[in-house]
Regions:
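Hydrophobic side chains within alpha-helical segments
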Residues: 27, 64, 96-100, 154, ...
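Alpha-helical transmembrane segments of multipass membrane proteins
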Residues: 106-113, 133-136, 163
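Short, well-ordered alpha-helical scaffold segment located
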Residues: 12-13, 45, 95
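Membrane-cytosol interface motif
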Residues: 146-166
Length: 183
């Protein structure tokens, strides 16, 4: 689906959307279900204010992931009717993002198991502790690469928690735009 900042569509194609779901996602993908095209225009830009607070950004990503996954479940019967190319685009864009936390946890677990099997439990534990220490020191001394890695990890974690909330039956109906430094 299109981003909520800016998209346009024919009024006749605009669907009825439940209040707790992502209207921009449903509205912008619905034309495909009725055989219409969705196009992107490269010379149109939209700007949104971004938050400068990591905690606000974490909550925002978590809320959006919960609503997006609930929206996916709402759209599932129609998604199955899409052609293979559109279904591939949808799955490769959405599923990988939603389940990145699970993939990351599995990667960490299997990496730890591999190190245990190759070098022993002590080496695996030392490697894990060294990784944690590197992250802590990088954040403490404000190393840009470490900060970027932590932000990526937090984004993946927020998305994973949002999906878990959706699977547990949680929904969000209202939201407050994040405050930015410009407010």
């Amino acid at each position: 689906g299109a981003g909520g900042a800016l998209f346009a569509m024919r009024r006749s194609l605009y669907p009825t959307i439940p209040i707790d779901l992502l209207d921009d996602m449903i509205a912008s993908i619905s034309p495909i279900f009725s055989g219409h095209r969705v196009v992107s225009v490269p010379d149109v830009y939209a700007f949104e204010r971004a938050t400068s607070d990591s905690a606000d950004e974490f909550r925002r990503k978590r809320r959006i992931a919960c609503r997006a996954f609930n929206t996916h479940r709402f759209l599932a019967p129609q998604l199955r009717t899409m052609g293979l190319l559109n279904r591939f685009k949808y799955v490769s864009h959405k599923y990988i993002r939603w389940f990145s936390a699970a993939f990351l946890l599995l990667w960490l677990l299997f990496t730890f198991i591999a190190i245990v099997s190759l070098a022993g439990i002590v080496a695996a534990t030392v490697t894990a502790l060294a990784g944690v220490l590197l992250l802590v020191l990088g954040l403490r001394f404000n190393l840009p690469l470490i900060g970027t890695l932590v932000e990526i990890f937090m984004s993946i974690l927020a998305t994973g928690l949002g999906v878990l909330e959706a699977l547990a039956g949680r929904s969000y109906q209202t939201w407050t735009p994040a405050k930015s430094r410009r407010d």
